[in-house]
C-alpha cells in the first residue's frame, strides 16, 4: 500500500532530497473543518488501519522500478526509498472519541519526506472511517436503544469500503453487520436471515417458512413481504412458528419487512403476532433507512425492534465526504527549536492553527459532561485547580470562565522514533468507549438539526502565535 499516495508526494520528496532538507523535522496536523450532515460532532475512526500501514511501510523492487521508469527521480532518491522506513512520531485521538472541527485528530512529527509520503493513506483511512462511524452513530441514536445492523456491503463503493465500513459502523454503535469478512477480519458480529429468493425457491410461502424454521429453529427470522405482508406473509409466518417452533418450546423468533409503509405494516403485524401468542417475536425492517426515516417511523408509532440499514449508512449518502485535511503546522530547527507555520486563506475557515499542539477536553466535575475542548501549545499544561477563562478564537469578546473541571489530554502517542508504543484495544471496547464518550456530551450538542455549537478554543499563547503569524504574512 506504500504506493497508494498522491504523485506530488513523491515529486516533493525527491525535491526535498535534492534540496538537502530530507531530514528536516516537520509537524503535520490532520483535522476537519465541518461536521457531516450539519451535526454537532464526529466520531474519530481509522487509527488501527493507519497503524498497520505505518508498520508495513516500504518500497518494493517493483515500486522502485516503476518510479525509475518515470524519469523524474534521482538515483540517490530511489536508493533512499529502497531502505525507506518511518522513523517519526505520531500522536492521535483514540478511535471512538467524539471530535470537533479544527482540532488535530492525528499529529505527525517526522522528517519531511516521511511526513509527506504518508499523507494520502492517513487522510483516506481517517476520513472514510470517521465518516461512516459518525453516520452510524447518528442512526443508532435515532433508533432510541433498538438494535441497528449494518446491511450495506452490496451498496458500498468498493470492497474495502464494505469491509472497513462495517468496522467503522460498529465503532459508531451498530450491533453487527451482514458482511461476513468484517466478522472474520475485525470481529464485527455477522448475521442475517434470508432473501426474497429463498421464499421464491419453494412451492409456496408457507413451505419456505416451514423449511427455514426447521433448518434454523433458534434463529428463525422470516422475510414476510415477498407477496403480501399482511394477507400472506405474517399469517404464514405465524403458522410456521406454531407448527415448527412451538412444539420445540421455542418462543423467540422474528419477522422482517423490506418494503411498504413500514410504520403502518409493523403496527398491524405486531397486533397479529401478539394475538397469536407470539409476543416475543421481534420485528425487523430494512429499505433505504437513515436517521430521519427511523425518527419519523418511531414518532408514528412503528412497532420495530431492529433496523437493518444499508446504503445510506455505508456510503453516508446524505453527505458522503469527510473533509479531513493534512496541513504543515511547524518545522523544527536542528537545535530543537520549533518554528510554527500557518496557512492563510481568503476563506477565514481555511486559516490553520499553527504549532505543535495539545488538545484538552474539559469536563465538569459535578456533571461529568464535556464543557469545551482547549487547544494549547505543546509545552503548556492546564491547571484544573484554577479557574480557566476560554474565548472564541474568531469572536474574542465571547468569553466563558470554567471552574470545578477536569482536563484530559486527547492526543496519545502512537509511534515514537518509528516504534509503535500504542496497543489498539479490542473493537468491542472501542465501541463501548464511543458510547460512553458520546454520553458525556450534552443533549443540545447531539441534536441532529441545529445542534448547539461545542466550544473548541485556543489558549492565549496559541492564539497570540496565530495572530502574529497572520499579521506577519500580510506585510
What are these regions (language model features)?
Residues 24-82:
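N-terminal, Lys/Arg-enriched amphipathic/low-complexity engagement segments
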Residues 1-27, 34-36, 72-73, 78-87, ...:
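Buried, small/hydrophobic-residue-enriched core segments of structured protein domains
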Residues 90-98, 469, 474:
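Short histidine-centered loop motifs in beta-beta connectors
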Amino acid at each position: 500500500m506504500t504506493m497508494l499516495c498522491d504523485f506530488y508526494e513523491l515529486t516533493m520528496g525527491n525535491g526535498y532530497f535534492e534540496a538537502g532538507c530530507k531530514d528536516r523535522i516537520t509537524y503535520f496536523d490532520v483535522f476537519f473543518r465541518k461536521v457531516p450532515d450539519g451535526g454537532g460532532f464526529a466520531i474519530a475512526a481509522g487509527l488501527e488501519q493507519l497503524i498497520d500501514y505505518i508498520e508495513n511501510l516500504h518500497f518494493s523492487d517493483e515500486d522502485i522500478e516503476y518510479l525509475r521508469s518515470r524519469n523524474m527521480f534521482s538515483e540517490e532518491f530511489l536508493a533512499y526509498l529502497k531502505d525507506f522506513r518511518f522513523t517519526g512520531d505520531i500522536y492521535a485521538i483514540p478511535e471512538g472519541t467524539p471530535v470537533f472541527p479544527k482540532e488535530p485528530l492525528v499529529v505527525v512529527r517526522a522528517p519531511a519526506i516521511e511526513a509527506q509520503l504518508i499523507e494520502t493513506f492517513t487522510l483516506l483511512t481517517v476520513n472514510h472511517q470517521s465518516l461512516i462511524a459518525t453516520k452510524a452513530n447518528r442512526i443508532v441514536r435515532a433508533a432510541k436503544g433498538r438494535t441497528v445492523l449494518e446491511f450495506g456491503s452490496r451498496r458500498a463503493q468498493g470492497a474495502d469500503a464494505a469491509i472497513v465500513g462495517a468496522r467503522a459502523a460498529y465503532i459508531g454503535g451498530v450491533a453487527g453487520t451482514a458482511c461476513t469478512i468484517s466478522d472474520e477480519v475485525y470481529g464485527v458480529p455477522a448475521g442475517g436471515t434470508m432473501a426474497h429468493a429463498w421464499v421464491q425457491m419453494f412451492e409456496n410461502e408457507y413451505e419456505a417458512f416451514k423449511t427455514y424454521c426447521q433448518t434454523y429453529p433458534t434463529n428463525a427470522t422470516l422475510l414476510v413481504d415477498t407477496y403480501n405482508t399482511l394477507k400472506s406473509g405474517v399469517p404464514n409466518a405465524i403458522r410456521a412458528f406454531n407448527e415448527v417452533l412451538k412444539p420445540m418450546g421455542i418462543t423467540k423468533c422474528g419477522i422482517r419487512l423490506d418494503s411498504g409503509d413500514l410504520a403502518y405494516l409493523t403496527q398491524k403485524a405486531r397486533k397479529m403476532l401478539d394475538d397469536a401468542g407470539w409476543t416475543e417475536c421481534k420485528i425487523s425492517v430494512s429499505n433505504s433507512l437513515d436517521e430521519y426515516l427511523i425518527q419519523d417511523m418511531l414518532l408514528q408509532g412503528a412497532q420495530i425492534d431492529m433496523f437493518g440499514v444499508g446504503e445510506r449508512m455505508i456510503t453516508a449518502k446524505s453527505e458522503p465526504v469527510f473533509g479531513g485535511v493534512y496541513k504543515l503546522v511547524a518545522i523544527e530547527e536542528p537545535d530543537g527549536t520549533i518554528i510554527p507555520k500557518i496557512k492563510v486563506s481568503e476563506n477565514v475557515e481555511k486559516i490553520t492553527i499553527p504549532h505543535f499542539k495539545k488538545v484538552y477536553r474539559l469536563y465538569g466535575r459535578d456533571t461529568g459532561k464535556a464543557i469545551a475542548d482547549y487547544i494549547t501549545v505543546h509545552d503548556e499544561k492546564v491547571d484544573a485547580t484554577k479557574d480557566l477563562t476560554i474565548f472564541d478564537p474568531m469572536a474574542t469578546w465571547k468569553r466563558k470562565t470554567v471552574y470545578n473541571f477536569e482536563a484530559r489530554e486527547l492526543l496519545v502517542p502512537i509511534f515514537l522514533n518509528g516504534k509503535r508504543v500504542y496497543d489498539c484495544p479490542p473493537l468491542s471496547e472501542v465501541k463501548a468507549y464511543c458510547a460512553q464518550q458520546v454520553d458525556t456530551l450534552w443533549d443540545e450538542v447531539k441534536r441532529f438539526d441545529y445542534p448547539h455549537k461545542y466550544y473548541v478554543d485556543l489558549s492565549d499563547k496559541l492564539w497570540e502565535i496565530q495572530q502574529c503569524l497572520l499579521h506577519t504574512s500580510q506585510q
